[in-house]
Amino acid sequence: MSTAQSDALTFECETGNYHTFCPISCVSWLYQKIEDSFFLVIGTKTCGYFLQNAMGVMIFAEPRYAMAELEEGDISAKLNDYGELRRLCLQIKKDRNPSVIFWIGTCTTEIIKMDLEGIAPKLEAEIRVPIVVARANGLDYAFTQGEDTVLAAMAQRCPLNLKNQSDNTSLKTSPHIPLVLFGSLPDPVVTQLTMELKKQGIFVSGWLPSKRYTELPVIKEGYYVAGVNPFLSRTATTLMRRRKTKLIGAPFPIGPDGTRAWIEKICSVMNVKPIGLEDREKAIWASLEDYISLIRGKSVFFMGDNLLEVSLARFLTRCGMTVYEIGIPYMDKRYQAAELALLKATCDKMNVMMPTIVEKPDNYNQVDRIRDLKPDLVITGMAHANPLEARGINTKWSVEFTFAQIHGFTNARDILELVTRPLRRNLSLSELGWDVYSKQS
C-alpha cells in the first residue's frame, strides 16, 4: 500500500470488479419515498429473484412495484415492445392508479437495445399517466447510483412554474434566491435539515424527490441546488446543464462536523451569517462521548461499496479513529471536492495520517492489506463480511449505513451505534470467555 502523504490525499486506481448490489435495489426505498408512484422493473428472472430476495417481506402487502419479465420472444424481437408495455401499464393504471410510472431499465434492456425512451412518450400520451424512464442497471459502479439515475430523470420533469399562483407569489417574496435540495431521505430527516436551515433564515423551496410526484419542486434557471448524498453526481450534472441551476458545492450533512460545514456553505452562498452552529456542534460531540470513547484510537478500513465511504471516513477520523484505506467503487472528484477538502482538514486537525483513497479496489489485494494492517474494524459489502469474520476480523455491512438515518446533527448517534456494535459485541463475548471460535487442542 502507498504511504499516505502529509500534504495531500493519495489517490490510487486498481483494476478490481465492482462488488456491489445491483442498482435496481433503489426501488426498495424510492417507492416508499414517492407515495403516489409505481415502479416497473423491466428485466429477466435474475432481476426478479434479486428483487424478491431484497424486498420479499413486502410482497404480501401489494407494494407499488412490479417485475416485467422479459421472455425469449422479447429478446428475439418476436413480441412487440410497445404492445406488451402498454398492456402492463394499463393494468397498473386500473389496479393502482398511480400519479407516475417509473420504468427501471436493467442490463438486459441495455444489451438488446430496447428503446424505452422512444416508447415512453407515445404510451404516456395514450394512457395519460406520466412515464419516467431510468436505466438503473448493473452496469453502474454502485447500487446507490440507481437513485442517482432516477432523480436525474425526475429533475427533467420538474415544473418551471407552479400552477397555484399564491405559491408562486411566496417564492417571489423569499428573502433569497430559491434553494432546492436533492437526495432521498426519510421524512423525519428531511424535516430536521429543513428546520436547521430555517433557523438560519434560509427557506428550502423544495426537495427532489418530493413525497408525491405531483408536488415536484419548481426548478428554474438561476436557482440554487445542494445535494445531501455523495452518490448524486449525475443528478447534480443534470440540474446544472439542463435546468441551468447553480450547484452549492458543500460537504455532505453526515456527522456534526459535516452538517455544520454543509449549513455554513449554504449560508455563505446566500450571504447569511450563521448563528449558533459552533455551540450546537460542540453540544452534539459532548453527547456522543460515550460512543466515541469506545472507538478512539481504533483503526478502520473501508473496502468500498456505496459511495458513502469518504463522508463516513471523515466523520470517524474526527471521532479519533485511524482510517487506513478508503476503498470506493467510483470517485467524482468535482462533486465531492468539498468533502475531500474537509477530510484533509479533519486529518490535519486530528494530526493523523491521510488515508489512501483507492478507486475500483481489487479485493484480493485488499485482503492482503487487511492481513498486514490488522484494522480493528472493516466496513465492507455483505459478500466479504462472513469470510473476514471467520478470519477473526471485525466487520460491519456498509449497506446498513445506506438505510440508516445518518444525516443531520442528531443522527450522528445512529452512525456510532452501527460502528461500535461489532466492537461492543466482541467485548461482551470476551467477558463471557467466548472469544475463541475453534476448539483448541
Curated annotation (Swiss-Prot):
Cofactor(s) demanded: [4Fe-4S] cluster
The keyword DNA-binding appears for this protein: no
Location(s) in or outside the cell: Plastid, Chloroplast
Pathway named in the protein's UniProt entry: Porphyrin-containing compound metabolism; chlorophyll biosynthesis (light-independent)
Residues engaged in binding [4Fe-4S] cluster: C22, C47, C107
Any Pfam family hit: Oxidored_nitro
GO biological process: light-independent chlorophyll biosynthetic process; photosynthesis, dark reaction
Cellular component annotations (GO), alphabetically ordered: chloroplast
Top-rank lineage group of the source organism: Eukaryota
GO molecular function list: 4 iron, 4 sulfur cluster binding; ATP binding; metal ion binding; oxidoreductase activity, acting on iron-sulfur proteins as donors; oxidoreductase activity, acting on the CH-CH group of donors, iron-sulfur protein as acceptor
UniProt KW keywords: 4Fe-4S, ATP-binding, Chlorophyll biosynthesis, Chloroplast, Iron, Iron-sulfur, Metal-binding, Nucleotide-binding, Oxidoreductase, Photosynthesis, Plastid
Keyword Membrane carried by entry: no
Record-listed E.C. numbers: 1.3.7.7
Catalytic activity: chlorophyllide a + oxidized 2[4Fe-4S]-[ferredoxin] + 2 ADP + 2 phosphate = protochlorophyllide a + reduced 2[4Fe-4S]-[ferredoxin] + 2 ATP + 2 H2O
Coiled coil: none
Cofactor binding annotation: Binds 1 [4Fe-4S] cluster per heterodimer. The cluster is bound at the heterodimer interface by residues from both subunits.
The protein's role, per its UniProt record: Component of the dark-operative protochlorophyllide reductase (DPOR) that uses Mg-ATP and reduced ferredoxin to reduce ring D of protochlorophyllide (Pchlide) to form chlorophyllide a (Chlide). This reaction is light-independent. The NB-protein (ChlN-ChlB) is the catalytic component of the complex.
UniProt cross-references to PANTHER family, sorted A to Z: LIGHT-INDEPENDENT PROTOCHLOROPHYLLIDE REDUCTASE SUBUNIT N
Family in the record: Belongs to the BchN/ChlN family.
Subunit details: Protochlorophyllide reductase is composed of three subunits; ChlL, ChlN and ChlB. Forms a heterotetramer of two ChlB and two ChlN subunits.
HAMAP family per the UniProt record, alphabetical: ChlN_BchN
UniProt name for this protein: Light-independent protochlorophyllide reductase subunit N
Species per Swiss-Prot/TrEMBL record: Pyropia yezoensis (Susabi-nori)
Gene this chain is encoded by: chlN
